């Protein structure tokens, strides 16, 4: 077999001279031995410590024998739904089944179950009644305590209870999984391993649980959503390894779920060690017949520079999963990996990304964090940058220069998100210049998300004027270096706090830019985010103030349609939304109008009214090619033409 992949069959296990593995890793993803995949990191890390690990990727959950490939492991089963929550992987925000799965050979959908951690855990428990089962990965991490589940529209128990598992290793997991392995290897019964940071365990009593904060019981959470809001905020304040408390969630008089404080962040040396493990950097060769695993295309020639994020966006789960303290790899580690990438036969000279959750975070936000942790009730960037913020891109600029100098490297792109408020806080502008000159290919995607103040505040995003200043500096810099490059803003509709009034405000912004996004992301209530808590409870858990929440599919469709008001297929929704918002003044023929009146449709005045009908024989404005693209400037053209996008930001921003 090509390469040194870990065994996926009993025959491969026997071929290594093993009679038994120490751990069996069951994954909802296909086996891809690349450090962008959690199963690759954890299994390689265990291998480096001398443990024997076998992998069962995407077992048939309808057949108990599918998890019996290696027999009973000596120490336990490790279970993960994969790189994504299985429900996000399977369903769009409208709860429609997705057609493809990028983490499955050939992109085939349906190779993992819904709520994969629960299903896999119970499947294993059917056969192996006493074998330890440890859950990990993002699905288990974000469902580790009672949580709102958008897809069933219910409050669910901790996944630890419903899966039949013994322990959850939450967060990134390197520290906790090694401690768990060592404890099991020492013969400690799994029910007695209750003390490891970064784990969640079950307890029958609180006699041996010390220094814990007791959360509302599950019954209390179900009885009153305000209890859930308060409980969630307590959890939110305890996501830091330096000052996080042990939390206890009661389920009955004899059943408690105990969350130990988070594991400590990795040091730079530990980060380097993790990413220097002998990954094959591709999918298992057994998938070749199906065309491989699509997800590899996005990450095969990318470098993971950091983890953790102090951005604090309310709709992002990173605070609960990776934490707010940024951890980074050394230049030497990244350069070594880049050199390995250049040896790949498919490498064309382009490194696709050097980043992580946020590309331009290359050190903790302030000097005190690695000793005292993050501030519990204050954010580093919101509502404005903290006075102690260390906004400095010199290390990142130096790294990017070294990567550009590697032989065979033609260009280094940055595709991870750029936090523009942090960029502006660095007054040197050195990074902005290098970003525009070397690391953008015509377009830079950024995420202002919205323009309305109340919505941005609930999102944890900077005021809109900050984004306006960034656009001004971006275009000024491009003019200075003689380049024509554009910003493409990501926008979100239907976030908590967004009424039709705020949605109209966002539509007017798009009108003033002369820009209609081809895709708009509806807010997606995924487990364990502040925004999801707002969606479920109707309050901001930080203040307990009421928040308007657009929930009906029809209102969400109206909010989305307003942003894409030029799409003829959405005309009726736009008209209805404008009437309901009391903004009928935007229906007409004036330069500020979004659409023309219904009674004169077909009059030939579309352009004047700010509404463009498709010409005869052309297709709607849903991202497909039109016969006359000149009428639709600002859109990415068809695949048979060179991709381009005009400057969607008005010239006033370039002053």
Describe each model-derived feature in a short phrase.
Residues 25, 56, 60-61, 340-488, ...:
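Conserved SAM/AdoMet-binding glycine-rich loop
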Residues 26-29, 290-317, 342, 350:
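N-terminal pre-triad scaffold of radical SAM enzymes
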Residues 38, 57-252, 259:
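Glycine-rich beta-alpha loop elements in corrinoid/cobalamin-binding modules
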Residues 166, 274, 309, 334, ...:
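Conserved, mostly hydrophobic/aromatic
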Residues 602-655:
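Intrinsically disordered, Lys/Arg-rich low-complexity segments
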């Amino acid at each position: 077999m090509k390469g040194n992949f870990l065994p996926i069959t009993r025959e491969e296990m026997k071929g290594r001279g093993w009679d038994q593995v120490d751990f069996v890793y069951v994954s909802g993803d296909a086996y891809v031995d690349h450090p962008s995949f959690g199963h690759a990191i954890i299994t390689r890390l265990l291998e480096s410590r001398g443990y024997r690990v076998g992998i069962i990727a995407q077992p048939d959950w309808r057949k108990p024998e599918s998890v019996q490939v290696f027999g009973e492991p000596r120490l336990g089963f490790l279970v993960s739904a994969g790189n994504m929550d299985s429900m996000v992987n399977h369903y769009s925000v409208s709860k429609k089944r997705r057609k493809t799965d990028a983490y499955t050979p050939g992109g085939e959908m349906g190779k993992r179950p819904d709520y994969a951690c629960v299903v896999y855990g119970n499947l294993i428990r059917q056969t192996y009644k006493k074998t330890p089962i440890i859950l990990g990965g993002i699905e288990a991490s974000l469902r580790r305590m009672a949580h709102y589940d958008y897809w069933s529209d219910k409050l669910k128990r901790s996944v630890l209870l419903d899966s039949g598992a013994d322990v959850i290793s939450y967060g990134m997991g390197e520290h906790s999984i090694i401690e768990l392995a060592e404890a099991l290897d020492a013969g400690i019964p799994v029910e007695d391993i209750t003390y490891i940071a970064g784990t969640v365990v079950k307890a029958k009593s609180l006699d041996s649980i010390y220094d814990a904060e007791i959360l509302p019981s599950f019954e209390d959470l179900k009885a009153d959503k305000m209890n859930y809001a308060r409980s969630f905020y307590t959890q939110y304040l305890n996501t830091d390894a330096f000052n996080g408390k042990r939390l206890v969630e009661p389920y009955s008089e004899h059943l408690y779920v105990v969350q130990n404080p988070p594991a400590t962040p990795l040091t730079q040396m530990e980060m380097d060690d993790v990413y220097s493990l002998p990954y094959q950097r591709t999918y298992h060769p057994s998938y070749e017949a199906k065309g491989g695993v699509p997800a590899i295309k996005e990450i095969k020639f990318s470098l993971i520079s950091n983890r953790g994020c102090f951005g604090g966006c309310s709709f992002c789960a990173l605070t609960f999963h990776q934490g707010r303290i940024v951890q980074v790899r050394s230049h030497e580690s990244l350069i070594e990996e880049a050199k390995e990438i250049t040896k790949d036969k498919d490498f064309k000279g382009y490194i696709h990304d050097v980043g992580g959750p946020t590309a331009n975070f290359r050190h903790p936000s302030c000097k005190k964090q690695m000793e005292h942790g993050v501030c519990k009730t204050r954010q580093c960037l919101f509502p404005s940058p903290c006075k102690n913020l260390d906004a400095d891109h010199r290390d990142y600029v130096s790294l990017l220069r070294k990567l550009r100098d590697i032989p065979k490297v033609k260009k280094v792109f940055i595709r991870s998100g750029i936090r523009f408020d942090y960029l502006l806080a660095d007054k040197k502008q050195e990074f902005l210049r290098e970003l525009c000159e070397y690391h953008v290919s015509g377009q830079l995607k950024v995420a202002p998300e919205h323009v309305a103040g109340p919505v941005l505040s609930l999102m944890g995003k900077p005021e809109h004027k900050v984004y306006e200043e960034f656009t001004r500096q971006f275009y000024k810099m491009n003019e200075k270096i003689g380049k024509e490059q554009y910003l493409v803003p990501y926008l979100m509709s239907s976030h908590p706090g967004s009424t039709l009034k705020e949605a109209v405000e966002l539509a007017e912004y798009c009108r003033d830019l002369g820009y209609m996004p081809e895709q708009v992301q509806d807010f997606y209530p995924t487990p364990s985010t502040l925004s999801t808590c707002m969606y479920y409870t109707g309050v901001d858990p930080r203040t307990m103030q009421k928040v308007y929440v657009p929930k009906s599919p029809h209102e969400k469709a109206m909010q989305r349609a307003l942003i894409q008001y030029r799409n003829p297929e959405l005309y009726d929704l736009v008209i209805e939304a404008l009437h309901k918002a009391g903004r009928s003044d935007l229906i007409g023929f004036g330069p500020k109008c979004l659409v023309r009146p219904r009674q004169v449709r077909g009059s030939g005045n579309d352009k004047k009214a700010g509404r463009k009908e498709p010409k005869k024989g052309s297709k709607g404005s849903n991202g497909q090619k039109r016969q006359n693209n000149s009428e639709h400037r600002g859109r990415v053209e068809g695949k048979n033409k060179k991709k381009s996008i005009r400057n969607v930001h008005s010239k006033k921003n370039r002053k």
